[in-house]
């Protein structure tokens, strides 16, 4: 199982991701593609369940985080994704503190530790 809070879902397609990938990998776009979750879903052979929580009041949502692109890739590839848009939440500690227990339970269920 995989989970994330407000991840940069398509780093090849946002300023933060492009800046980070340039710093890590230079201008070798093939290396960028090997680390972009939205692109990797197209070639994934495992279908691990994914949980993403995203606040709908997050100021980075549209330009930087772009979860809709990841959601589209998962739908296109029949990859299990639960994308939860949380009303009124931003990119803060309170957002994570509110939903961290859900993420822990998500992984515990995937591991068969709880029902």
Segments (PLM) and residue ranges:
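Non-catalytic cap/lid and distal C-terminal segments of serine-dependent acyl enzymes
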Residues: 1-115
